[in-house]
Each structure stands twice: as structure tokens, then as C-alpha cells.
Amino acid sequence: MTIEHNEINMPTKYEPSNVEAGKYKWWLEKEFFKAEGNTDKKPYSIVIPPPNVTGKLHLGHAWDTTLQDIITRMKRMQGFDTLYLPGMDHAGIATQAKVEAKLKESNVSRYDLGRENFVDKTWEWKEEYAEFIREQWEKLGLGLDYSRERFTLDDGLSDAVKKVFVTLYNKGLIYRGQYIINWDPEAKTALSDIEVIHKDIEGSFYHLKYPLTDGSGYLEVATTRPETIPGDTAVAVHPKDERYQHLIGKTIMLPILNREIPIVADEYVEREFGSGAVKITPAHDPNDFEVGNRHELPRIIVMHEDGTMNKNAGKYDGLDRFVARKEIIQDFKDLGLFIKQEPHLHSVGHSERTGAVVEPYLSLQWFVKMEPLAAEALELQKTENKVNFVPARFEKTYETWMDNIHDWCISRQLWWGHRIPAWYHKETGEIYVGESEPENLSEWEQDEDVLDTWFSSALWPFSTMGWPDTENPDFQHFFPTNTLVTGYDIIFFWVSRMIFQSVEFTGERPFKDTLIHGLVRDSEGRKMSKSLGNGVDPIEVIDKYGADSLRYTLATGSSPGQDLKFSYEKVESTWNFINKIWNASRFVLMNLDGMKYNEIDLSNVTEVSDKWILTRLNETIQAVTSLGEKYEFGEVGRTLYNFIWDDFCDWYIEIAKIPLYGEDEVAKQTTRSVLAYTLNATMRLLHPFMPFVTEEIWQNLPHEGESITIAEWPKVNEQQIDTKSSTAMATLVEVIRAVRNIRSEVNTPLSKPIVLEIKPKDTTYKEILEQNISYIERFCNPEQVTISFDVEASKTAMTAVVSGAEIFIPLEALIDLNVEIARLEKELEKWNKEVARVQGKLNNERFISKAPESVVAEERLKEKDYLDKKASVLERIETLKEV
């Protein structure tokens, strides 16, 4: 279908809100983003990393999804059956914490509601906030297939979760056991490592005496957590530490509790650290837990789930753990067993959701046995069907993690999430694990816990495609997916888990490529955070500058694997770029004279400038396509920017004005064809980055088809590549630029004619310059041009050297030398004053000692700048005086 627009529907000024209005809804109504499931077309699929259904998306989400959308838009235009699948994550603890906080405002707890009613309330929250997220996706212009939208708690995905849990359990790869986990005493749940934020805290090392039972002395131990002392069941020393050889096997009398505990030898102990003797608390430290297992030590839990001390803590029973810390230290002092307290900066885990200090805690939990699953996943990386990491260095990061993996605690003490499909017989204690409920359900009690959110999101690439139904058309056609786009901070928590679950349950990699990006940082390179107040709401940026400005800035702002430094200046620069495109497009449209798509005719292209711009267009198509395949979107952005701003806008459009404003109708029509053809192809190349403004411009141009979203991706036309014209135009551009620079140096406006002498390098360049002298005349305004091997620079000439020639412009023809010398001497006086002023500051000791370093540094930069300018003016004065 061909749509013609003979009227220009583009306002004088680019207004993003007007350009973007209505387009997304129209795209959805027309189902441009709906995957066909057409097996005759090559499939290309990306599943969106599901955002937590907890509210606003941040700049990292905007970056992540923009990259995904660029890839899928490009592939759609290249003829692939493209699926960009949307969805959201139920985000167990994050969502439950939000809902509980909301209930707290009404003085209601989840326990007041009961489990079923609380879960219903959370579903209401989900429906409300899911709509917010969709609105943000719309604002960004994401080409999502909403007919396939999924949620990690929907029925299909829940079936997949049960199937995986039961299968792994039956294989002995899921088990229930007591291990040290991250415990949030405020939320009263286990936490995954990613839910623990480590902060450097000014704490203390407490050095204490542990008396030997036989009264012969004591061992010095040091701890940052005295509250765990009641749980000590041994003191460990290194087996080769000569200081303690005679004590191995003897016992300590644990102070305060007066419990006898052994001295054990273990290589875990670092002899050089502290006294070389370490207290072992197997129920409250992961390393001590391992030591305890090796020596069959008892595990004594000394805290309740809320972080208060329990009866195993003796006299400290009922105290908050941090109150107990103080009292225990005081008791050691009273007993004469306190040695010293040293300040100690150390990393302390805090719950991401509640802010509580995380407690390493021995707890009965469900675990996935990781070693065999990791081994399978690592074997995949040795085959042709491996996951390709972009950049490749992250494959090593992934492999190192998998080589050193620990069993995965998958149970959470929450109500919102996939409830563990395990039931306990009320009388016999028998465990039943199954995809369906046990018979005689009233005799059984289901496990109260839910699964870690990452358990369901690890199945995301294939569960969203209908698995475990392997006959599902989407699973058959779109799995494995093509590209996962995600940050390097979740390679361990998500990427690795998707790979091993996919290998285990489908025998396939979950995605062919994983494009790893960094973090969004502020302009100073700092991580964005509430405490720094440097966070940026992407919707606010869109409201001010438009989605296209934000998308292009994010997509082109860094290389794969690198962090992105965000600044409003960069967005504004993109906004200026779009304005340039807008104005250039309006110029083209105003000069097409109602040209229709089928009237575009490139058969009469003879002008060097026309051949050159078509050559540059094809070089740009080649570069953008190739770089896009490698995910080098920063380079794509630079390539498009240079072509559009420099080649098309600054040069070709200016050159095109000659025939457009002339009398030759054939030349006019050819120029219109080249303008329309080039701008149309350029908009298609730019479309994945700037979907809204390119649709607007494309709809106004002569075009074929209903929307640019489904228009054909430009292909290289070898017949349009003319290297001879490229060389010629490059030479002309260099000459014109050099002449303009000389004019600028001596303050001579373009309106004043000059004498121009050009000495070509060889006959090829002489031919180029002579055959295209009209360009030099048009853009240099010479009253006389000489192109000859015989010309030489006169003493008064300003000179420039370009790749194909030397350029001479006699100065006396440009300026009155005496007037110019007087002007320069006045300018010299100005720079002398500036140099004196800034050096006065820098020679002032008070200024140097009191001013901030940044201010002093700025003054030093000014001094260098002013001295350089002064030297330049002096040099010009001396040159002119010699003349």
C-alpha cells in the first residue's frame, strides 16, 4: 500500500509531545508488534527481563528495554517474525513489603487479614501497579506483543514452577535441610544474596579471654559479634600453628555460660590474623557452620526469628541482639576477661527491603543441589550451542561463579509467591511433593513457605513460551530466544540460573546471546541512589525532551559491558540533533513539489554531489547494519549522527539548493529524488532508536507501506557506490573547509570575495578541482580561482594543506593590514589583562590555601587558555608586520 502526502503536516517547531501523541496506540491497534508465529519467516525473540510489580521503572529499566526494543525493531524491519514478549515479576519480598507498609498506614498487619485475604490484597496491588508499568512502556515506545504478556504467578507459569520443583525433588536435586542463610529479623524471612545490601560500618573488634578449663591460662579471641558468644561450641586454631600445638584437644570454659567447649585444629584459621585463635559458632556463621560439620560440633541457635535472644543465651534471653552485645561485653569486663576494643570498618549486610541488619542464621530451609546442575551448564559452554556473552569477558565471570557455586536456598518465609508444593502428613510426618494436592487433603498440611522469586524467573525464557507443553507453537517457533539484555550485576542471580534450568529442562540454551550492560551512573560516575539524591525519573525526562531523545541518549551512551554516565546535557544534545533532523526534513518536504513515491527516479544521477551522498548513504547502511548485529549501538549512533548532521544536513542540503533554486527542471527532479530517497532510507535506519519522530517524518515523505515500523530495512545497493565521486567530494569538502577556516582566522565574511590559488597534488586532484569548480565558487565566493601546478605561496598569503592540494589566499586581498594589526593589538591588550588577573589570583597564597581545589584547578586552566590565546595573537601580529 502506498500512502501519499502532498501537504506538509510538520509544524515549524519540533514538539515531542505532539509528535508522540497517539502513535503508540495506533501501532497497537494495527498489531504491528504482534508476532505472527509464521514458520515461513525466520523467528527472532526477546523476552523482557520482568520488572518487579512494585511501581515506577527507573533509568536502568529504560536503558535495558530501549536496547531490547532497538534490536527487535531492527529485526522486524529485516523481515524476521519478531517477538518482544512483555511480562512482570511478582517480586516476593519486595511486593509483600510494599503491601504490608500500605496496610500499616491503617494499623492493619498481614496477620490481621490472614493469608488468603492478604494474598487477595496483593493481587489488587499487582493489577494497579501493572497498569503503571504498561503506561511507562508506552511512554518509552516499546514494541511489545501484549497478546503474549505473562506474569510470574499466572497459571501457566505456576504449572511450570511446580513441574520443575517436583522433578528436581524426585531427582534428589531439591532437599530440605538446616543451613546458614541470610535472615531478615524484621521481615522474618530468608533472603537471597541479591536482597542483601552490604554497607561499610564503623564497628569494633572485641578482644576477649577464653580461659582454659584446666586453669593453665587462656586463649585470646576477637569478634565483631559478641552477641553470638552463647552459641560458641569450639575455639579453632591452625593445625600447624606451633603456639597452640599443645592445646589441640584440650577444652575452654566458655565464659558467662560456663559451658566446656573443645579446642579444634582446622585449616580454615588464618594463623597471621589476630591471635590465630577463632571462636566457632556453627549456627550463626557460614564459615563456622562448615568447621562445625568437619568436627561434628553441636549447632546452638541463640536468637529468635525476630532478632531477640532466646533461652539458649542464658541470662540474655529476651534481649534485643544489640542490647545483648553491650551487656555481654560489660560482663566480660566485670569478670576481668576483657582485653581491648579496636575500631574496625567492616562490611555488614542489610536487608534491601527493611534495612534491618541481616543475621547469618541456621534455619530449616529448602535448597537446590547446585553442583550437578552447574556442571551441566558449564558443559554447554564447550559446545557450538553455548550462550555467547557480549562482551566475551563476562563468560569468564559466569564460569568462575558456576565453578564455585553453593547450594541455593529457595524457600522464603512469605505469603506472596509460589507456595512450595510439599505437604506434611499431620500424623505420620510423611512428606509428599507433587504437582497436584495429595488425596485426603484434610490429613495433610502444606508447607507454609513460598519459593524464592528467582526460582520462577529462572524459567522465564521457556515458561513464557508455553513450557512444559513442548508442542506449544510459540515454544516450537521462538525458543531458544535470540538475545537476553541485562546488567552485569545479575549474571550470578539470574543469567546463570536461567542457563542451568534451561539446560536441565529443555536441553537447550535459553538464549543465543546475552548482551551485558553496566549500571546507569550520574555525570560524575556515581551510582544513582536516594541518599545522594541523584536519581532520575525517565518519565520526567520524556515529558521534557521526548522519548526519542531519551532512547537515543541511553542507547548510544556507552559500549557493551560499560557503565553509562547520564546527564541532562547529553539528552539536550540529542534533542538538538532531532531538531536538526526535523528542520532538514521540513526543507526537503517543502522542496519535493508533491513528488509521489513512484516518481522517485535515480536513473539520471550524474552530479558528483548526488553520487557522493548516495555512496555515503550506502556506506552508512552497511556500517549501521553490521554494527547493529554486534550490538555496538554507541558506534551506530555516532555513524548516523555524522552522516545526518555532517554529510546530509551541512553539505548535501546546502549543495542541493543550487539545482533546486535553478532553472534546470531535470536537475531539480533528480535532486528531489535523491533528497526523498536518502531521507526515507535514513529515517528507516534511525527508526529503532527514535521510533516516534521517524514515523512522523516518514509518513510525510513519499513512501510505500502503512508504517515505518514494518517498512523494509535499507539494503546496500552496490550500483550506487561510486568511490571516484567520494574521493572528489572529500577533496572539495576539505578545500571549502580550509578556505572557511582561513576566512575565520582573519575575520573576513563570506560575502567578501577573495583571490584563491590552489596547487593540486597530482593530475587526478587537478581534474577533480577543475571539473567541480562550481562548488568552490558557490561555497568560497572567490573573485578569482587559479588551479595550477605552478602557483606558489606569496609572502603575504595565508596557506592551508589538504590531502589533495595546497591552498593559498593572498592577505592583502582580504584585509587592510594596518586596520587588522590595530584590531589584534587591542585584542592582545585584552588577553594581557586576563592573564594578569588570573595570575594575580594564583600568586595569592591566601587564595591558594583557602579556595577549594576545584576552583584553583579551574583558574589554572583559565591561565593556560589565556596564555595560549595571547601567544596566538602575538604570532599573528608579527606575521602581519613582516608583510
UniProtKB/Swiss-Prot annotation:
Domain notes: ValRS has two distinct active sites: one for aminoacylation and one for editing. The misactivated threonine is translocated from the active site to the editing site. The C-terminal coiled-coil domain is crucial for aminoacylation activity.
Coiled coil: 811-847
GO biological process: valyl-tRNA aminoacylation
Protein family according to the UniProt entry: Belongs to the class-I aminoacyl-tRNA synthetase family. ValS type 1 subfamily.
UniProt keywords, alphabetically: Aminoacyl-tRNA synthetase, ATP-binding, Coiled coil, Cytoplasm, Ligase, Nucleotide-binding, Protein biosynthesis
Motif ('HIGH' region): 51-61
Top-level lineage group: Bacteria
Purpose: Catalyzes the attachment of valine to tRNA(Val). As ValRS can inadvertently accommodate and process structurally similar amino acids such as threonine, to avoid such errors, it has a 'posttransfer' editing activity that hydrolyzes mischarged Thr-tRNA(Val) in a tRNA-dependent manner.
Any one cellular-component term (Gene Ontology): cytosol
SUPFAM superfamilies: Anticodon-binding domain of a subclass of class I aminoacyl-tRNA synthetases, Nucleotidylyl transferase, tRNA-binding arm, ValRS/IleRS/LeuRS editing domain
The reaction(s) this protein catalyses: tRNA(Val) + L-valine + ATP = L-valyl-tRNA(Val) + AMP + diphosphate
Family matches, as InterPro entries: aa-tRNA-synth_I_CS, aa-tRNA-synth_Ia, Anticodon_Ia_Val, M/V/L/I-tRNA-synth_anticd-bd, Rossmann-like_a/b/a_fold, tRNA-bd_arm, tRNAsynth_Ia_anticodon-bd, Val-tRNA_synth_C_sf
Compartments it resides in: Cytoplasm
Entries under Pfam families matching the protein: Anticodon_1, tRNA-synt_1, Val_tRNA-synt_C
MF terms in GO: aminoacyl-tRNA deacylase activity; ATP binding; valine-tRNA ligase activity
Species of the source: Listeria monocytogenes serotype 4b (strain F2365)
Record EC number: 6.1.1.9
UniProt KW Magnesium keyword: no
NCBIfam families (UniProt xref): PRK05729.1, valS
Assembly with partners or alone: Monomer.
Residues holding ATP: 530
HAMAP family for the chain: Val_tRNA_synth_type1
Protein name per UniProt: Valine--tRNA ligase
Keyword Ligase: yes
Motif ('KMSKS' region): 527-531
